[in-house]
Each structure stands twice: as structure tokens, then as C-alpha cells.
Amino acid sequence: MSGFANTVYADLVGQDQVIEILQNAVATTRAETEPINYSIHGMTHAWLFTGPPGSGRSNAAIAFAQALICPNNGCGSCKECKSAANGAHPDVEIVRTEGLSIKVDEVRELLSRVAWAPAMGGWRVVVMEDADRLTESAANALLKAIEEPGNRTVWLLCAPTLHDVLPTIRSRCRHLQLVTPSTDAVAQVLQTRDGISATMANFAARVSQGHIGRARYLATNETVRNSRSTIMKLPLTLQGISSAFAAAQTLIDLATQQATEAAETRNEKELDDLSLAYGKGATGRGMATGGSKAIKDLAKEQKTRQTRMIRDGLDSALLDIATFYRDVMLVQAGAHDALVNKELENEINTMAEKTKPQATIKKINAIMVARTNLGHNAAPLLTVEALMCNLAR
């Protein structure tokens, strides 16, 4: 990674091959004449970044956007790079959905915004962080724009896997697959860039399994570490139906608490800003036209966002629990040296002795099914209760 220090790619851990492709694409644009010939050089009008959670697919897309509009090919320090990263550059649109899906009306509104030529004379870049959340009608609306792009418009789509994006869209994109960084690489980044102790960095990197954002969050937040500790002990409490329901409620409570705390400050600031814009303190006729509706719309948006945050929190918790059973399976296979949860080694060994590998595999599969169901908008409490009952068997 040393070769990419002090550039927009500095935070992409273990993605050297992807970075080199992006750097080459940016370099070819500097020598291009109008119109851009996408068929010959490394640049193209649509890119699809895929990779597991924590691989940095969104960070890679945003870094590429910065490099395209940067006069120095992505220095990371100029005003263009900084404004693009913050979503404040007029030619860089970063689409982040706060809800469970991206609807067709949102895509149509986006298309109307990006239809104009670049304001600064370079590129107009659209980063869509959650392309996998496009509804079918929204994806079809986006397809037309990708099929007939402006000469200086670049689409950067992000999704966990190729199969999370419609075939008609992915076939028109250049695909870049990011990988999960090694735990050693993540630990090194936490130490050198965040000043975290070696012990804490190694722990956070190990239990996050290479998810650098999650690792940093764990390493710097004691409350999050305590919540994870509670979650990791839940499998040990599953002795029957009543304990399964209690464990499910604990998961729901923890996810709700974390989502509420994370959203509280942001929600308050958004409401204050909106109230100020429409005449703070005024009511009824004293409030600017549309103010009441805007506040109601904001409340609805915030509720949707919190719902997604709860689901994301549950998904993260289920992944953590899956690592417990993964460790049990490794011990049952005789591999004691590759445990994720070394702090629970005694408990893992005990469960490995009491259960069979086939049962462990079924439990891991049940967790993955529950995660899929949550992603498909299943009721969180019922989904988690059913899962805990399966794990208690």
C-alpha cells in the first residue's frame, strides 16, 4: 500500500490490482480527445464495483470519482478531491439510500440532475453505493441512462456481488472485484493511521474478519465492544424455547439501541436545519409554504432510515454469531489455530465436544437464511425468534 499513500486510494487496503486499473483509466483520459473512445482505452462510461462487506467497494468508487475530477490524478489534498469526497462537488453525485430500496422516482430525479454537462469542464460522475437495492422499475430507468450516457458522464455502481445487479445493467459495466483485506493488513492500518495499540488492532481486525470499517468501529468504541461480547455469549444461553425467545429479544434490543443512538444527533440536526429553512418557531400560516409537509416527509425518511439501521445492525450481529459456530466447526475438524473468537476458546471447545459437525453446519445455514430473509424485508423479531429456536435445538 505504500505506493498509494498520500493519494485518494490510501484507505483501500489490499486492493492494489484494482487501484492500478483505476489509475490507468484516469491516465488514459488525460490524453483523450473528443469524443472519448471507450472501446480502445482503459476508461469506460460505466463501472461496477463488487466485493464483500468491508472490502471498500464504495470507497474505491468515490476515490475513482475524486481522481477523475482532480487536476493531479487523485492527490487527495486539493479542493476538488476534498469536495468530491464530501459530496459537495458540483460534478460528483454520491447516491446513498437511507431506506430499504432505491425507487424509480428517486432514479428519475437523479437522471434529471445529471443530464447536464459537467459544470467544471471535466467529468460528471455518479456514484451509486447501493445498486443492489434498486427496485426492478428503478433499475430499468437507470439502464436507459447507462445505455445512452453523456460523453462526459461516468456511472460507478456498487454492489456485494454481480448477481445482485440486473444482467442487463452489469453487462454494460466494466466489473471490478474487490477482495477482503487480510487481518494483518487491517491491523497495520489501524495502528499506523489511527494510532490504535497493537493488541486492540489485532483483536478488532481478527473479529471483524478484514472489515476495516467494522474493525475501526470496534477498536474505538467500548460500548460496541461490550455489545458484541453480549451477542457472542448468546449461543451459550440457548437451552430451550424460552431462552431462544429471550436471546432474540436481546438481539432486537441491542440493534434498536445502537440504531437509535446513532440516529439521534443526526435526526435532531436535520430537523433544526429544516425548521430554520422554513422559519423556525413559526406555525400554521407563519411557516413558509411547504414547511409542514417537509417536516412530515423528513420524519418519514428518518423512520425509514432507522428501520434500515436496525436491520443492518441485526445482520452484523448474525454474522458475529455465525463466526462462533464457524469456530465450533473448525474445532470439530481439528483446526484449533484459526479461531476468530479466541477469547471464547473454552466455550467453543465444549460445544464442539457436545455437538456433531452436521448440526453445526445446519446452524450456520440457518443463520444465512435468516440474513437473507431480513434482506427481503421479513419481520425482524419473528425472523430472529425463529432462528434462535433453530439454534437451540
Predicted features by range, described:
Residues M1-Q66, S83, R152, P160-A317, ...:
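Charged, glycine-rich active-site and insertion segments that engage polyanionic ligands
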Residues D130-L134, L162:
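Conserved Walker B
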Residues V126, L156-A159:
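Conserved D-loop beta-strand region of ABC ATPase nucleotide-binding domains
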Residues A65-G76, G150:
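Post-Walker A helix-loop "phosphate-sensing" segment adjacent to the P-loop in P-loop NTPases
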Residues Q23-A25, E34-Y38, V104-V125, R133, ...:
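Conserved alpha-helical scaffold flanking the Walker A/P-loop in AAA+ ATPase domains
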Residues A115, N140-L157, P167:
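Conserved catalytic/switch belt of AAA+ P-loop NTPases
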